[in-house]
């Protein structure tokens, strides 16, 4: 598995706990608060210092972007999103896109390309993953 140190300890501990719960007849549900998506296509955005840092969405007052590359919400109140001021808007990345600032874009692209991210509106991010583990009868 290529695990070392604390990762191996956590994996072994989790396995031990799940095995013990199974032996005692317990059903276990494992879940997350959201899913993720692998991102590989950068979309350049410009914003001021107050613009959010998330890679899958941005909110702020002075966002500059190509509107064909993002899903934009110009009136957050229309979709019940919070607004920090009267001129705030939101943009969301499509598919496997991720949003990077124009300044230092190449460094961010190298760092974040092919990573798993969340915060967008794709099915993969909005569906909550879970698994139900039942003991053998």
Q: Where does each model-flagged region fall?
A:
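Active-site neighborhoods of enzymes that stabilize oxyanions during catalysis
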Residues: 39, 44-137
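Metal-dependent active-site segment of extracytoplasmic phospho-/sulfohydrolases and closely related
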Residues: 17-46
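Short glycine- and Lys/Arg-enriched binding-loop motifs that mark or flank ligand-binding interfaces
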Residues: 1, 31, 116
């Amino acid at each position: 598995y290529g695990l070392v140190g604390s990762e191996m300890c956590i994996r072994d501990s989790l396995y031990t706990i799940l095995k013990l719960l199974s032996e005692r007849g317990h059903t276990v549900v494992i879940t997350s608060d959201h899913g993720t998506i692998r991102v590989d296509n950068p979309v350049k955005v410009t914003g001021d210092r107050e613009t959010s840092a998330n890679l899958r969405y941005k909110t702020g007052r002075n966002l500059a972007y190509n509107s064909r590359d993002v899903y934009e919400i110009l009136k957050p109140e229309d979709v019940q999103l919070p607004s920090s001021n009267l001129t705030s808007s939101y943009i969301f990345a499509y598919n496997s896109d991720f949003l990077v600032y124009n300044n230092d874009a190449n460094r961010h692209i190298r760092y974040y390309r092919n990573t798993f991210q969340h915060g967008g509106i794709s099915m993969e991010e909005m569906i909550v993953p879970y698994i139900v583990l039942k003991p053998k009868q």
